Amino acid sequence: MNMKYITSGLFAAMIVSSTAFLTSCADDLEVGKNIDESAYSGIYENNAYLRDGKSNLVSKVVELHGETYATTVKMGLSKTPNTATSAKVKIDAAYLETYNKAHNTDFALYPQDLVTFANEGILTVNANTKSAEVEMTIRAGEGLQEDKTYAIPVAISDQSSDITIKDEDAKHCIYLVKDMRNAGDAYKGEGVMQGYLFFEVNDVNPLNTLSFQLENGKLLWDVVVLFAANINYDAEAGRPRVQCNPNVQYLLDNNETLLQPLRRRGVKVLLGLLGNHDITGLAQLSEQGAKDFAREVAQYCKAYNLDGVNYDDEYSNSPDLSNPSLTNPSTAAAARLCYETKQAMPDKLVTVFDWGQMYGVATVDGVDAKEWIDIVVANYG
């Protein structure tokens, strides 16, 4: 009797426990609730994107040192197709207005009759591969203006029905072309190691750069950095700004005499920037602060006809975090400044000296560092 009682009691307890469990589950279960499935909407799509084939860059600067420049345009896919699929590439002249507006630039369209695509621009991605390339040739022309940047916006068109294009950025890549045929004294060939010369602006004439030549007559130095202007806090405006000491400003004011002769020989001239013992710094700007400072740097390069900038993260004090233009020092903040600078002047060089927080982040907003840093100058101690 006792055993029967215990078994019956255990069975009753299990029923009560199971009922409680089911009741508890019912409290958490919402039948018929709408679920946001937008995150899964593209899982079956095969998204295409466009790049320069040689560099794998979305935005590629091309310097014409000869009569022709050859490269390839690459279309990549997010998935491997089961069967061959295809698309075409073409020049999308209308897109240039959108691009110029986004970057606050005024690039002119490169003469379309000087650009040709092999195979009528048709790209065929074979089964079990994820990309295809087509040759593109850019020819020089008599009407090109020196010291002017032209743009070639290339777009995907006539794609097969199984190819999806996510947005305009994925659909396009752009070539920024400069005629350098008469400014080739420093050019030693594509992909050749370049020499960077940092010189102290307080007591050195930049034209001394032209005194150094190789045995073949080519100039030794490819890039000259004016070392250096500063980032400083503008108390009246309440934001960081570019500050030039009298010697830097003298070179800028007399750039036709002291700087442009270098550029006419093919030497790139960059404005060096570093901290200057106050609350601002190149690696401690907020996102908005970086955008504002980058736009000012771009205006300096445009106004004084310079080839870009070199950032050096030194000599900055702790930031005032109550200022919306500033943030804690970090490699992420430094990367943001480089990214925003490239956005503001895509045809110019954005370079950094590998010191402090100035280098070490791989992407900003999903964009690879090679798109917004052109050169990292190593610290040799």
Question: What kind of feature is each model-predicted range?
Answer:
Residues 16-17, 136, 276:
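Short intrinsically disordered, low-complexity segments
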Residues 187-206, 218-381:
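Chitinase-like catalytic core of GlcNAc-active glycosidases
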Residues 16, 123-126, 284, 325:
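Short N-terminal micro-motifs specific to bacterial/archaeal maturation
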Residues 20-24:
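C-terminal motif of bacterial Sec signal peptides marking the signal peptidase cleavage site
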Residues 11-19:
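Hydrophobic helical h-region of N-terminal Sec-dependent signal peptides
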Residues 1-11:
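Bacterial N-terminal signal peptides that target proteins for export
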Residues 26-218:
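Acidic/polar, low-complexity intrinsically disordered N-terminal segments immediately downstream
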